Amino acid sequence: MLELDYNLTTLEKIIAIVADYARQGGMPTSYLDKMAADLIRIHKCEPAFLGFTPTGKAGLGGYPAVMCVSINGEVIHGIPSDDKILQDGDVVKLDCGIKMPDGQYDDGATTVLVGDCSATARKLVKSTKEALEAGIKQAKAGKTNHDITKAIEAVAKRDGFAVVHGYGGHGIGTELHMEPHIANEMLYKEDGETPVDEPVKLTSGMRIAIEPMFASKRGFVKTAADGWTLQIIGGGIAAHFEKTVTIK
């Protein structure tokens, strides 16, 4: 029986319950989406992802589900389906967002292993989770978004994994996606020392979603034919964790 930590947020409890079912395998990913929808309603929240249209996706009419369920080489934004059945050995990313009764948003994700997974998969998931923890340690007033980025990137380098290029965390509050961007890797100008973007100082009360995404081989990605699912190019698997934190 799943025992939930009372210190978990509403969203973390929802994701933990869905994850407990997902790791058993044998069910379609659409079942996990329906479960998330039911739990969100029970907690008197609203699904943040359903109908959400991020920058560059205006022509798609909004995301069609409550939860993103991405398998193996899929990184994020996988659309739940009756045809996608979780199998032994799958690496499953569960990403969900809610709008709470007070009007604030929350965003979170976890990666679960179904059955007997490879040593690489286990190490990748452990590394990505540790990167999240390293990033959270830097999420303090007076620090910058670059401090979080460097902490996440250092874990990937330590463990020999690739950071998924071009994606990362974000500010969150009365909107799902807000400034600042929390990158998972530092990008520098031609001199190799000057960051491409200016650091943003973290201030007390600011809420940010930190979300490392690592790949077992290369970090280059493409969008699948469905217009949403982000896939690793050249094979391999990916892991993704996310937590919304308040700066103190």
What are these regions (language model features)?
Residues M1-K248:
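Active-site neighborhoods and metal-handling regions in enzymes and metal-associated proteins
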